[in-house]
């Protein structure tokens, strides 16, 4: 029995560990270090209809507990992803989750319909955290009704299950999650980055050319845990958790909060082997805690009658 196997809508995962979108590109650089087939899945970099060159530099800044980024969804565009990146990934025995983004509802729908037809794309990750709605400038990811309508329209055209990536930069993330579930989402991924800023003490100016950026890394982990804990008790669709994961112990904490799988982001920049290391470490950790299968950990922190976990002597 594979103690790490996880079944999610559209995804049969050999283990619940995957690199998060935006921290792994399309896998080419990491394939020089290890066989990508060891991963549970790969969340590829966000894809838009046309190529995007991203924001001006500098667009990355280190922080004491992680990093800020303002990349700006740089990507080669839909055609190149379909013609080059996804075919290259077919050599690996790993399901692909395609992260899609757009500036308009129409762009989201067009990209979703096209990329969901690729043979190795098993699910979509709907990135509603960055773009704005045409004719109004309302962020897709911060207004429940708008997020729900976008989810509904993408679901209508997608050939694979749709997971929606939630922004933590909202007043009520539970309300957002419920609206998206009611619109037909198959799952959630959370959390995306928090808006932050660093200022250069010598110049008095923001370090990032964009001014603000997305904070990720260990600093956001307690926020991610809290939000997953709340959302997982309010919805019935599965959650892929992310936000500051570095170790196998971090993975279990996310599972206890209510996640059914996890994505590792910023840690890939620190250690390119972090994902296979976590995968290798998980079985021994389960043994130490007397846990038979990783799925036993889902929601343990809040489920009625859940037994406490005690390390074996």
UniProtKB/Swiss-Prot annotation:
Record note on cofactor: Binds 1 FMN per subunit.
Name this polypeptide is given: Dihydroorotate dehydrogenase B (NAD(+)), catalytic subunit
Organism of provenance: Geobacillus kaustophilus (strain HTA426)
Pfam families: DHO_dh
Entry function: Catalyzes the conversion of dihydroorotate to orotate with NAD(+) as electron acceptor.
Active site: 130 (nucleophile)
Quaternary structure and partners: Heterotetramer of 2 PyrK and 2 PyrD type B subunits.
Main location, first listed in the record: cytoplasm
């Amino acid at each position: 029995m594979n103690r790490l196997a996880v079944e999610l809508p559209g995804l049969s995962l050999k283990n619940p560990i995957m690199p998060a979108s935006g921290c792994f590109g399309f896998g080419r650089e990491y394939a020089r270090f290890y066989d990508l087939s060891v991963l549970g899945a790969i969340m590829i970099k966000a894809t838009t209809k046309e190529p995007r060159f991203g924001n001006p530099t500098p667009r990355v800044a280190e922080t004491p507990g992680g990093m800020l980024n303002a990349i700006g969804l740089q990507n080669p565009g839909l055609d190149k992803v379909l013609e080059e990146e996804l075919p290259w990934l077919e050599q690996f025995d790993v399901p692909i989750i395609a992260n899609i983004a757009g500036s308009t509802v129409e762009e989201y729908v067009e990209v979703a319909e096209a990329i969901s037809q690729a043979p190795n794309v098993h699910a979509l990750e709907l990135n509603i955290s960055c773009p704005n709605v045409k004719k109004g400038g309302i962020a897709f990811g911060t207004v429940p009704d708008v997020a729900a309508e976008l989810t509904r329209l993408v679901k209508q055209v997608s050939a694979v299950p749709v997971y929606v990536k939630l922004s933590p930069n909202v007043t009520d993330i539970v309300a957002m999650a419920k609206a998206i579930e009611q619109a037909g989402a198959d799952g959630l991924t959370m959390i995306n980055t928090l808006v932050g800023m660093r200022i250069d003490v010598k110049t008095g100016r923001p370090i990032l050319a964009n001014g603000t950026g997305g904070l990720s890394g260990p600093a956001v982990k307690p926020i991610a845990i809290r939000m997953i804990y709340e959302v997982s008790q309010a919805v019935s669709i599965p959650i892929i958790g992310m936000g500051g994961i570095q170790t196998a112990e971090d993975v279990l904490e996310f599972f206890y909060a209510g996640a059914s799988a996890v994505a590792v982001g910023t840690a890939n920049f620190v250690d390119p082997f972090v994902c296979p290391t976590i995968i290798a470490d998980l079985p021994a950790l389960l043994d130490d805690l007397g846990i038979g299968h990783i799925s036993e950990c889902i929601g343990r922190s809040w489920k009625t009658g859940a037994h406490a976990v005690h390390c074996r002597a």
